[in-house]
């Protein structure tokens, strides 16, 4: 008998639910939501697609194409949310301001939001956007888990060094409430660790599978 993380089966059944340009268009505020956030080109869409074994989130060579809150249903009461990519230079300033306004409204109002997965490019961590998200998580006591993405772009030693460095910086500035790991979509590095976080936040217990 082995123990299988039930979030794996749910993620494999993930399907697109709806897109929302503003909070009023979001699904009913009930159940469990986990939001995926990240600066443009941090590998957010690739991470989502890897965790769901599907091409749910749009990937593009032009970062910042995700302009809406995109909801993906795992079951009747659990959802993943792809938040707008933020910070790409080619996006007009008024559009950036629009994104930020509705991103802040979503983060500040959703009672069903159980945690935020924040993507950081392991080669360029702790941007101003990342720190803004960490500040918000601390102020609102929202659980946050960081994926240091694109870990395959660094050697094992360099990736570990970056992980330890970012862990230390976060601990000093934001306390012990933030967890962090290395992640690579192409290599599927760190996928099981990410699943465990999702299962915990969505209150799914490991179940024995015969």
Curated annotation (Swiss-Prot):
Molecular function as annotated in GO: GTP binding; metal ion binding
GO terms, biological process: division septum assembly
InterPro entries: G_ENGB_dom, GTP-bd, GTP-bd_ribosome_bio_YsxC, P-loop_NTPase
Cofactor(s) of this protein: Mg(2+)
One Pfam family here: MMR_HSR1
Binding site for Mg(2+): 45, 66
EngB-type G domain location: 30-204
GO cellular component term, pick one: cytosol
Keyword Glycoprotein (UniProt): no
Protein keywords: Cell cycle, Cell division, GTP-binding, Magnesium, Metal-binding, Nucleotide-binding, Septation
Entry binding sites for GTP: 38-45, 64-68, 82-85, 149-152, 182-185
Entry-linked CDD domains: YihA_EngB
Similarity remark: Belongs to the TRAFAC class TrmE-Era-EngA-EngB-Septin-like GTPase superfamily. EngB GTPase family.
Role this protein plays: Necessary for normal cell division and for the maintenance of normal septation.
Protein name: Probable GTP-binding protein EngB
Species assigned in the record: Pseudomonas putida (strain ATCC 700007 / DSM 6899 / JCM 31910 / BCRC 17059 / LMG 24140 / F1)
Source organism phylogeny: Bacteria, Pseudomonadati, Pseudomonadota, Gammaproteobacteria, Pseudomonadales
């Amino acid at each position: 008998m082995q123990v299988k993380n039930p979030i794996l089966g749910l993620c494999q059944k993930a399907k697109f639910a709806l897109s929302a340009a503003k909070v009023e268009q979001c699904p009913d505020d009930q159940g469990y939501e986990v939001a995926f956030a990240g600066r443009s080109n941090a590998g957010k869409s690739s991470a989502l697609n890897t965790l769901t074994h599907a091409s749910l989130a749009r990937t593009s060579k032009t970062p910042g194409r995700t302009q809406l809150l995109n909801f993906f249903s795992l079951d009747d009461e659990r959802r993943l949310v792809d938040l707008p990519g933020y910070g790409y230079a080619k996006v007009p300033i008024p559009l950036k301001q629009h994104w930020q306004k509705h991103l802040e409204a979503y983060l500040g109002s959703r009672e069903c939001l159980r945690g935020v997965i924040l993507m950081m490019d392991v080669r360029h961590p702790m941007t101003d956007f990342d720190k803004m998200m960490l500040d918000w998580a601390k102020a609102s006591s929202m659980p946050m888990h960081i994926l240091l993405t694109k870990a395959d772009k660094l050697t094992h030693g360099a990736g570990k060094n970056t992980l330890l460095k970012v862990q230390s910086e976060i601990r000093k500035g934001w306390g012990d409430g933030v967890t962090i790991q290395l992640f690579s979509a192409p290599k599927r590095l760190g996928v099981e660790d990410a699943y465990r976080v999702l299962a915990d936040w969505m209150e799914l217990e490991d179940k024995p599978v015969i």
